[in-house]
Amino acid sequence: MAKQIKYGEEARRALERGVNAVADTVKVTLGPRGRNVVLDKKYGSPTVTNDGVTIAREIELEDPFENQGAQLLKEAATKTNDIAGDGTTTATLLAQAMVREGLKNLAAGANPMLLRRGIAKAVDAAVEGLKRISKPIDNKESIAHVASISAADEEIGKLIAEAMDKVGKDGVITVEESKTLGTTLEVVEGMQFDRGYISPYMVTDAEKMEAVLEEPVILITDKKISNIQDLLPLLEQIVQQGKKLLIIADDVEGEALATLIVNKLRGTFTCVAVKAPGFGDRRKEMLQDIAILTGGQVISEELGYDLKDVRLDMLGRARQVKVTKEYTTIVGGAGDPSEIKKRVNQIKAQIEETTSDYDREKLQERLAKLAGGVAVIQAGAATETELKEKKHRIEDALAATKAAVEEGIVPGGGIALLNVIEDVQKVVDSLEGDFKTGAKIVLRALEEPVRQIATNAGVDGSVIVEKIKAAKDPNFGYDAYKEEFTDMFKAGIVDPTKVTRTALQNAASIASMILTTEAIVVDIPEKNTGMPNPGAGMDMM
């Protein structure tokens, strides 16, 4: 297919127009008085959102050269969202500011490679500055503040703080759509997996149709159990000690299942059997997780164990096990805390290494089940459009809160970036020529978020920036919601350090890429010739 090419200034200006198309659409959503953007959907009702990355993903431009710029900026937003889960609008805005200033300097004859190195030096100084002013976040109130600001809703903030308090920072918190109007929180303690009892005859509470075993022993195996002879030696020991038994196996069927049910109905002993969770290699890993959590061993031929040889001390133990038709929950596993910690660290290392989003999600789930628990926030609203928008906000707030727990918090409202201007100024003063010009590009861009938040609130951004700079107080800033100057930390207006840092680094990366671009190659769009005319006059036979 033939290509068309643009070079030099013409190419960069096309990229800039693409960047502006995305940034101008996204930046109206910044801050507490940011506006919404309506996204057209081919089917169904339009989506109303103020989430930067959701808006950016929808934008495709007709001009292929400009579209390259739009796609590059989208990358900055998406990368920020993937790493920090929030800050996409800030990243977009910073990148636009750096591209605008950079192109002015290139037009004046600056060397793009030196500009790039100047930008990198300035960003490094800004990141160090952010680390310096960052404060750790450890109490429930601070967590609620961060979540409330991201979601622009105090109620959601409190729910997220409550969820994180219950399941810990390694726990999994998921957001689901509720069938009711209200937004609620549900917490599952211990390890839960999506497998229920093999037979309804195993229930201990016929009214609720669930089996609850107090202080049971747990047989964990990857084998299919169909012959009761394999289990007899173990069952005799369990009956003698009056224990209750949970079997987690590949399957329990035939004679073995019938015998277990008959003995349960006669009241000889209580036993519940469930199928092992997961599939393939993931099943082996999950069985090992359960074994470590309960202090038992996986009975597997791979490890040289046979069911006939199982002793009581090889079984896991827990405070309580609850089994419903669909789920099994193990609470208070009796595993060795140091072994559990080792396993948690091993899963964390795998999360760092994996490149697959699906694998990462599954590893996060396993980590949560071992480390804390699972919390589900049920988002409810009056209409489907409102529900989608609310779910988006909760997911954003959740990501921002996790980022805050990881790296701490800085004053919000764009003030943190103004606070690191001094750090960047020192770098600017130490450089010369185009290096210095590159660092100055970042210096100017750092003011942009405060300026835009103020503009969205209907006030003059430049006046606000100058007032904040003149105050010389690191926590002094502009509360756009109340339209007043205040101490940002005291007012609870804070941003996660990780979000601000990631937004700045990704914006600089994309801006540097655009400034050092010398040519763009795109396909020449094919002319649509239309469908060939079918043979006329042919009767249908």
Swiss-Prot record:
Q: Which positions bind ATP?
A: T29, L30, G31, P32, D86, G87, T88, T89, T90, G413, D495
Question: What InterPro entries does this protein map onto?
Answer: Chaperonin_Cpn60_CS (IPR018370), Cpn60/GroEL (IPR001844), Cpn60/GroEL/TCP-1 (IPR002423), GroEL-like_apical_dom_sf (IPR027409), GROEL-like_equatorial_sf (IPR027413), TCP-1-like_intermed_sf (IPR027410)
Question: What CDD domains does the database record attribute to this sequence?
Answer: GroEL
Domain of life of the native organism: Bacteria
One GO biological process term is: protein refolding
The residue stretches assigned to a coiled coil in this entry are none
Q: Which GO terms describe its cellular component?
A: cytoplasm
Its subcellular locations are: Cytoplasm
According to UniProt, the reaction catalysed is: ATP + H2O + a folded polypeptide = ADP + phosphate + an unfolded polypeptide
What EC number is given for this enzyme?
A: 5.6.1.7
Extract the PROSITE patterns matched here: CHAPERONINS_CPN60 (PS00296)
Pfam families tied to this protein: Cpn60_TCP1 (PF00118)
Family per UniProt?
Belongs to the chaperonin (HSP60) family.
Q: What binding partners and quaternary form does the record give?
A: Forms a cylinder of 14 subunits composed of two heptameric rings stacked back-to-back. Interacts with the co-chaperonin GroES.
**Protein name according to UniProt:** Chaperonin GroEL
Query: Its gene?
Result: groEL
